[in-house]
Amino acid sequence: MTIAERIVSVIPHAPVQLRLSGRQANHASSLKFFLTPGRLVACTWIPVLLCACAMTAAQSSHEWVATWQGSPTPGGTFYSPGCPSDVGLNSQTVRNVVHVSAGGDWVRVRLSNNAGLIPLAVGSASIARSSGGAATVPGTLRPLRFGGESSILIAAGGEALSDPIPMTVHALDNLDVSVYLPGSTGPSTQHYFAAQENFLAAGDQTGSGTATPFSTTISCWMFVSGVDVRADNKVRGTLIAFGDSITDGYLSTTNANRRYPDDLANALAARKGNTLSVVNAGIIGNELLTIRPQLEFGYTAPFRFGRDAVNQAGAGAVILLEGINDIGDRSAKASDLIPVYLQLILAAHEAGLKIYGATLTPFGGSNAIYGGDYGTPAGEAQRQLVNAWIRTSGAFDGVIDFDKAVRDPANPTQLLPAYVGDPLHPNDAGYQAMANAVDLDAILEAILAD
């Protein structure tokens, strides 16, 4: 297959209709997938989406589920010495360390040029189990293929899903996804805040299992946006944690996987019976209403909801925690945010997904750090109005009261002192308290009932 044959044009604003089977087909005969208007994507994206929804008879006891996600955002708008996405890479290999939630016997990887301005030439890519740092577990390194080829050109705005390969992946494994970029990429697709050290090496080091060539450490993920596994039949779908920096795990311990979705993954992996995978669709600084000038904060929640939630393999339910940045950064009112929540609820339900509304966590005392209406009386009034609506409207399939889980009973506008990372963000203990507030039994029961 030629490169030209692997590139297709997406008609602006035209949704993609996919045939469904299984749980999602009970809700609709077709599903509209939200794609970036006017973009080009590698055509491997389309058939593999179909693969994610329709299982063959030989695969009847297994289902593809998303096991890791790093929602992609543009580079080039915010210089950081820890993440060279502003200038990109040139004849370098990036080794991304990703922490999966569920295991399986086959794996596939999503590479992303979603925010690229020019086509992205990938010379080669590989996956392996990580043994720590940039080193891999001996004997586990596998090359990735795209339509049978080791290289692929991904159009600007596009993504490419690798061919599935047999590989034993265990729940809670760390995997090394290495991508070689033979030419200059320009400003690069990234996930800016990784809470994970990743690595760069000169030249093509995708086949190297040692850490030696990877002499540079970076703080972001680059060019990889997802990993799926073919899980056994006790993994009944994917739970998507969708949100901003609090979901992204800002101020959690680096390299320790202590974000609240990681804590959910730990609980789900420990279950003896039916369970779920969980992926993190949080983006630091993300908002419901506004694309911020710093594009590493991502596009608005409605803009990216299809890509980061609906289109995830095995998607069954979403936890939505968004809005605090709209209040703090934009002085948004509850009346501004509620229609957006309703839009996302409708999108989830049309796709056959459950969606759970999470109350906004306390931010008292954060104004000195973040300015705006973060922690002001006006901002607090809007937070309370939003939370009252989430709790009482009945619009969501359920409510997760993160506010109650982490607030200080003696001063409920602020985080409990033991949970403070800063006045806006929880620490590891606070993220664990958030995870403890999620009724996983109820979510799993709701998914299985469909």
Cite the ranges covered by each PLM segment:
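Bacterial N-terminal signal peptides
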Residues: 41-52
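Surface-exposed amphipathic alpha-helices with a cationic face
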Residues: 341-349
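N-terminal secretory targeting modules
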Residues: 43, 55-242, 247-256, 272-273, ...
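Phosphate-binding active sites in nucleotide-utilizing proteins
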Residues: 256-259, 263-268, 272-280
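Structural recognition of the beta-strand scaffold that forms the well-ordered cores
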Residues: 238-242, 247, 277-282, 316-321, ...
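N-terminal secretory signal peptides that target proteins for export/translocation
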Residues: 1-37
